[in-house]
Amino acid sequence: MSDNDTIVAQATPPGRGGVGILRISGLKAREVAETVLGKLPKPRYADYLPFKDADGSVLDQGIALWFPGPNSFTGEDVLELQGHGGPVILDLLLKRILTIPGLRIARPGEFSERAFLNDKLDLAQAEAIADLIDASSEQAARSALNSLQGAFSARVNHLVEALTHLRIYVEAAIDFPDEEIDFLSDGKIEAQLNDVIADLDAVRAEARQGSLLREGMKVVIAGRPNAGKSSLLNALAGREAAIVTDIAGTTRDVLREHIHIDGMPLHIIDTAGLREASDEVERIGIERAWQEIEQADRVLFMVDGTTTDAVDPAEIWPEFIARLPAKLPITVVRNKADITGETLGMSELNGHALIRLSARTGEGVDVLRNHLKQSMGFDTNMEGGFLARRRHLQALEQAAEHLQQGKAQLLGAWAGELLAEELRLAQQNLSEITGEFTSDDLLGRIFSSFCIGK
């Protein structure tokens, strides 16, 4: 297998459909056109032609599109054949194309990888293709499209350019210490560094929003049996996703629902009631519940308001609180306010949010929705924006750390060499986002997660 091979893959989903598309990219795309179509179509024009087998018989008839390199998606010669979407027809056509020497089936994401390697896309834009396909909401799709069109990359490149300019001044001061202007001590470097830090903080804030749009928030509903966990899941989902009865221990396994709150994806997980298990099935369910709790972004600690007047989680169930991960955020949800007569709404207690509601009637559930949105810092009024992955956030955080360390070197010891090194490392972190500085291993992991025909 070589990167110089001509590759072919189905670009439409497998199965039956009105249209099926095969995409070919590489040096032999021209030969495929001449062999299967009998001619080379006019560049970038739709040509209605028969698709022929080796014996001259017609396999299908459809649209052929020819994009000679470098003016194509991959930067190579690209041919697209758009025929009927039957799996048998597409399979026959694919087998016909693969009889031509030098062609092979594309790896997942290989078309996008070639576009990146041929400077048609940077890495953030290439990732945005997969994110656009996987978008679960309108806002996520729009943000992915912004990333594909270069919005995120432009912000990152602006930061890289600013750091390059800053490094020039710092390294000039190091290399020419006898010059009249001392760049390190006249305040210019500090002012420029502060500007870059402020710009980076703004990008980090937008990236966190973009990460929420892409990844969503994992919320686990946990508590004792019959506290109303499944009723709350149904109320948040807006449908009867879970069976609700008065029998304690009805929920034996993990139930998952994916919803959106004003565009923010929310992964809600209902778990088995936590208690001493009465049988092996319940024990396994409780064990899975704890596994989900430990991986949550937030836990909704469900409390049956008819069984206790306590509001402090450590007082309600100290053993449960003691077992939770130290930094895991908790929201105490006192349920059954329709029975207890408690005032609906939210308050703060010892660093925890406390919400009183009725999962059965739905009263107070909107307060919980708003709380979940605000607790993650999600901005529904965000204009534009872009999607961000975990690796993007990590690179931005590392760059911010290096800039803060560089600032400390500047203000503390005026150590120009150490400042220059911190600036270089920050620049390297940012360049990893767009692929200007990226390991082959990372590229392999990123593109292998794409669809076959992308």
From Swiss-Prot:
Binding site for K(+): N226, T245, I247, T250
UniProt-recorded Gene Ontology molecular function terms: GTP binding; GTPase activity; metal ion binding
CC annotations in GO: cytosol
Main function: Exhibits a very high intrinsic GTPase hydrolysis rate. Involved in the addition of a carboxymethylaminomethyl (cmnm) group at the wobble position (U34) of certain tRNAs, forming tRNA-cmnm(5)s(2)U34.
Provenance organism: Escherichia coli O127:H6 (strain E2348/69 / EPEC)
UniProt-listed GO biological process terms: tRNA methylation; tRNA wobble uridine modification
Positions contributing to (6S)-5-formyl-5,6,7,8-tetrahydrofolate binding: R23, E80, K120, K454
Name the record gives this protein: tRNA modification GTPase MnmE
Primary location group: cytoplasm
PROSITE patterns: G_TRME
